Amino acid sequence: DYREIGRWLGEQLRTKKQKIGVIADWKMSEAVQAEICGLNEALEGSESKISWCIYRRKEQDIVERMKKETKADALVVLDAGILEEFGEQAENGTYEGAELYGVGYSLKTIALLDNGNIQGLAVPDGYEIGYKSVEEITKRIEHRSYKMQGYITEYQVLGKENFSMDEDLERFLYSYE
């Protein structure tokens, strides 16, 4: 449920007054729109506000694009590739900027969270998403009149304060079996 993911990310940011920048994938994606809607809902009534939103375009240099925007205290990155890129820059000491929160799918993003390079991470169950998608496509191919359905899949939420790679990785991976 992408709206819930956005809402969880917003809950992490509403506790103190912050300017928030959002970096997202394709603007017309239903997932991105739902995540941003949930983020806005969670921030409602708080002193934290979204200052700007950048939707990634093909071959666009996000860092250069961000330089044109006002400084943000926190970044919500709804593009897993960009979150991983920024996290790696933080790990290498080349990222100097806002705290990072976002959506990630890889063990690399989880390791970046564990190292403190990412402050909050929502991890959708990519396996279940792919499996259900293929299952629905198969039903549609087999039965032309079948109306494909959407599904709500599970996701894990991890914060740097409550996650330790040593203690939680096995439990985390087991939850996706």
Residue ranges and their predicted role:
Residues T15, G45-E47, Y95, N115-G116:
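Short, well-ordered coil/turn elements that cap or connect secondary structure elements
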Residues D1-G21, Y105-T109, P124-H143:
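Hydrophobic alpha-helical segments within soluble ligand-binding/sensing domains
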Residues G21-E30:
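Short beta-strand->loop
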